[in-house]
Every structure is written in C-alpha cells, then in structure tokens.
C-alpha cells in the first residue's frame, strides 16, 4: 500500500523549482484568482525557513512591506506556484532564520555568498 502512495506522490513532485536555501532571496510568482480572472502575483523576500518532506515540502519567505514585516508560507510543489526565481544567494549559518523577525533596517541584511 505504501508503495502506491509513494509512487503517486513521486508523480506530483515538481522539477522546475530551482535549488535554493535559507538566506537566499527569491521571487515567487503565485497564481491568484480574483473573480473570474487569474493573474500572477509576485512575492519577493528572504527564505527564512525550509521544510523538506517530499510532496509536503514548504518554505517561508519574509519581506518588509511599508515598514511592516510580512511572511508567507508556500508549499513547494503546489500548482498555485507559477515559478520560483532565485535572485541572490545568502551566506548564513543557521537552518531557521527566525531571528530576523527581531531585527530591522540594516541589521536584518544578509551577507551575499560569493562562490
């Protein structure tokens, strides 16, 4: 029984999502349906958390909008996500960057990773 479930989940995994990590700046294009129209809405920010659970994987993106911190959790393999674009690689030493919630301004910046 579990083999059937694994096979069905494997078919639904997306392969068009780029490899990104915590600290990276990404732009997520989300399909939004308003009334009868569908449009794309961009959400750009820093990935502060990533949860790898196969089909149930998720990541949290944080941005500052009008001086207010906004966080949004996206399901990695959701059909509502049109695309994920990697803007900038960040150099961090933590798996979860929840400490950024308490920082503001220049203190909340993340060093860029130079390969």
UniProtKB/Swiss-Prot annotation:
UniProt keyword list: Ribonucleoprotein, Ribosomal protein
UniProt-listed GO biological process terms: translation
NCBIfam families found in the cross-reference section: rplS_bact
HAMAP family assigned to the protein according to its UniProt record, in alphabetical order: Ribosomal_bL19
Domain of life: Bacteria
One term under GO cellular component: cytosolic large ribosomal subunit
Function summary: This protein is located at the 30S-50S ribosomal subunit interface and may play a role in the structure and function of the aminoacyl-tRNA binding site.
Gene Ontology MF annotations: structural constituent of ribosome
InterPro entries, per database record: Ribosomal_bL19 (IPR001857), Ribosomal_bL19_CS (IPR018257), Ribosomal_bL19_sf (IPR038657), Translation_prot_SH3-like_sf (IPR008991)
Record's keyword annotation contains Ribosomal protein: yes
Family membership noted in the UniProt record: Belongs to the bacterial ribosomal protein bL19 family.
Protein name, entry field: Large ribosomal subunit protein bL19
